[in-house]
Curated annotation (Swiss-Prot):
GO biological process, one term: translation
SMART domains noted in UniProt: KH (SM00322)
Region entry Disordered, spans: 214-233
GO cellular component, one term: cytosolic small ribosomal subunit
Pfam family, one: Ribosomal_S3_C
Every KH type-2 domain range: 39-107
Entry keyword set: Ribonucleoprotein, Ribosomal protein, RNA-binding, rRNA-binding
NCBIfam families from the UniProt entry: rpsC_bact
The name this protein goes by in its record: Small ribosomal subunit protein uS3
UniProt-recorded Gene Ontology molecular function terms: mRNA binding; rRNA binding; structural constituent of ribosome
Protein source organism: Afipia carboxidovorans (strain ATCC 49405 / DSM 1227 / KCTC 32145 / OM5) (Oligotropha carboxidovorans)
Gene3D superfamilies per the UniProt record, alphabetical: 3.30.300.20, Ribosomal protein S3, C-terminal domain (3.30.1140.32)
Entry similarity comment: Belongs to the universal ribosomal protein uS3 family.
Keyword Protein biosynthesis attached: no
UniProt gene name: rpsC
Amino acid sequence: MGQKINPIGLRLGINRTWDSRWFAGKGDYAKLLHEDVRIREVLMKELKQAAVARIVIERPHKKCRVSVYSARPGVVIGKKGADIDKLKKKVAEITESDVVINIVEIRKPELDATLVAESIAQQLERRVAFRRAMKRAVQSAMRLGAQGIRINCSGRLGGAEIARMEWYREGRVPLHTLRADVDYGVATAFTTFGTCGVKVWLFKGEILEHDPMAQDKRLNEGGGDSRPRRDAA
């Protein structure tokens, strides 16, 4: 089943944790869940150019804390923090509570599966040859320390009449090993011939301790792929 299931979902509670971290009673759960969906939709729409990999939402008492993981934090913050203030107002309208937005910089976007997938999708939309885009992403990831990477592209590749799937892999990507730190990302390229799907599996090594927060700690300690950039109260 490791070949079929989402690698992140398979490892939740082992070495990965949820992107929405809060508890609610029966009466509030659906409302808060819809709020999370709307928050992510608004932020992803506003931050198209910011290379956002993930959005983590936490809800301490009567507050909403949103952490935006971005490869371009300057685009999120804006001039003198103007853009981040606008985002806070929009999120506050949805949640009707105090909002705190943290920006976390991704220092190595080549080692983030979501950003790699989006980069390839953007290249396909610009009519870059799909094999060249895939090989370039594989080489960049391996050069920066990935232990393995696999990329799948499917659809009318190169404008072909018949849709097909092509993939590249380098190194090892152990999908059945639960202690393996396997990142997974998907993206869709909207080309003139139709849509093309891009999937990326990226193996960064093994996490030996049983800690769902292990990956987040590695990211925030500065030795990983990202570091905290700003806390906008």
